[in-house]
Amino acid sequence: MPTVVHDAMKRAKNDIEYILFLRKGGEYRTTPTLQKALSMLSRDEMKTWFRSIWSDLRGASTREGHPAPYPPEVAERLIKMFSFAGDTVLDPFAGTGSTSQAAIITGRNSIANEIEPAYVNIAQHRITKAARHHRFVGAIEAEVIFNGDVRSTPIPVDNRVPAAV
């Protein structure tokens, strides 16, 4: 009997991730009507996405070789929930570019920063592919910046990937 319990525990996995939403202080900005219209969420999206716990998403694949993968739908939801079409999404820890890819798909601009060269190459490929396949109004450009450790390299290398090819 203890063997069965032991085997079951080998497969136990904690798939809970906490998401913190932080906002710059001050007044809310005025958003143009067209930008708001392009960013509308459906009633079902509002109902599902603004819950405290999301139980409708599946885990991400580790096939990309990154140690901390997450489902692309997580980034897409958060971007659509907390930004408007045409806004810029900053991802300081870009990894393989999931957030920038989601930004392009949802019509946002993206600036991504990653220190690992192997991940930068994967991110550039994914962003370029997303830019070719998604013609959403609002997306202007995406950048993947490889600048090593930003504490010692204050000037980033310009490595832009055009989103509207």
Regions found by a protein language model. Name each.
Residues 1-122, 165:
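Core catalytic lobe of class I
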